[in-house]
């Protein structure tokens, strides 16, 4: 006798390749990004900045934004909230944005997380040397390695203060402030969906 299959519902946000390409196109048109992907990223990125665990690199996940950033796990939610709270240092108040545009937490998290990763790419494009290396990212490798041995809020605080991450955070807020209306139009389209999994 076969056991009964257990179907459970899971909330998720589906960031499609078309959606990501439209964001790339927007920032290329605004001359914030150069056309194409900085190849140095493929040399030195072993895992995702925004969501660890991805290993395959292509145009879609070069920003390291996972297909599903929605989570009900308390430790993951705490990390998301810490990231958003930390951006208040640079003038980004996610609670204000949520209220102003009637967006939910994960829409705003998706938005600023993607802008953060675009901040990394802008930095890489501008700091690449004649050999295709990024000095600032190479110098930060030891800090990323050290961060893996930390835990809890100490780890989160240290991570946000790694020079590469600080720069990307600042650029994310700058991009939002500069293109707020257009960026909001992109990310208000994102909805939390329900899917059934066995």
Annotate each language-model stretch with its function.
Residues 121-134, 177-186:
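Substrate-binding/catalytic groove segments of enzymes
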Residues 16-19, 108-111, 115-118:
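Extended low-polarity, hydrophobic cluster-rich segments
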Residues 112-125, 168:
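Active-site recognition of the HExxH zinc-binding catalytic motif
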Residues 4-14, 18-19, 148-198:
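Long, well-structured alpha-helical subdomains associated
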Residues 105-109, 124-160, 164:
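Post-HEXXH active-site segment of zinc metalloproteases
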Residues 87-98, 113-115, 129, 133-135:
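Catalytic phosphate/metal-binding cores of nucleic-acid and nucleotide-processing enzymes, i.e., regions
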Residues 1-103, 182, 187, 193-195:
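A metal-dependent hydrolase signature that marks the N-terminal structural subdomain at the beginning
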Residues 23-31, 118, 122, 176:
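Hydrophobic, Leu/Ile/Phe/Ala-enriched alpha-helical segments that form helix-helix packing faces
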């Amino acid at each position: 006798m076969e056991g009964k299959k257990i179907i459970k519902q899971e909330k998720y946000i589906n960031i499609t390749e078309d959606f990501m390409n439209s964001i790339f196109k927007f920032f290329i048109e605004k001359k914030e990004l150069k056309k194409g992907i900085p190849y140095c990223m493929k040399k030195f990125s072993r895992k995702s900045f925004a969501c660890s665990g991805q290993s395959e690199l292509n145009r879609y996940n070069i920003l390291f934004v996972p297909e599903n950033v929605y989570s009900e796990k308390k430790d993951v939610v705490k990390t998301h909230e810490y990231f958003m709270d930390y951006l208040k240092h640079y003038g980004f108040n996610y609670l204000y944005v949520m209220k102003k545009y009637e967006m939910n937490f994960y829409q705003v998290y998706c938005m600023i997380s993607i802008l953060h990763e675009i901040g990394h790419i802008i930095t890489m494009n501008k700091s690449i040397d004649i050999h295709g290396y990024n000095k600032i990212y190479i110098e930060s490798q030891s800090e990323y390695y050290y961060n893996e041995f930390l835990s809890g809020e100490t780890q989160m605080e240290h991570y946000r203060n790694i020079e590469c991450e600080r720069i990307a955070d600042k650029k994310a807020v700058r991009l939002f402030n500069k293109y707020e209306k257009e960026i909001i139009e992109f990310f208000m389209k994102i909805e939390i969906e329900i899917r059934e999994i066995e």
